[in-house]
Amino acid sequence: MMKLVIILIVLLLVSFAAY
């Protein structure tokens, strides 16, 4: 369950970095 939360956070960070 925690892994899903971590993955979502990582995706958000990547999206901000790509922006």
UniProtKB/Swiss-Prot annotation:
<dbReference type="InterPro" id="IPR025881">
    <property type="entry name" value="Toxin_Ibs"/>
</dbReference>
<keyword id="KW-1133">Transmembrane helix</keyword>
<dbReference type="Pfam" id="PF13956">
    <property type="entry name" value="Ibs_toxin"/>
</dbReference>
<keyword id="KW-0472">Membrane</keyword>
<keyword id="KW-0812">Transmembrane</keyword>
<comment type="function">
    <text>Toxic component of a type I toxin-antitoxin (TA) system.</text>
</comment>
<feature type="transmembrane region" description="Helical">
    <location>
        <begin position="4"/>
        <end position="18"/>
    </location>
</feature>
<protein>
    <recommendedName>
        <fullName>Small toxic protein IbsD</fullName>
    </recommendedName>
</protein>
<keyword id="KW-1277">Toxin-antitoxin system</keyword>
<dbReference type="GO" id="GO:0016020">
    <property type="term" value="C:membrane"/>
</dbReference>
<comment type="similarity">
    <text>Belongs to the Ibs toxic protein family.</text>
</comment>
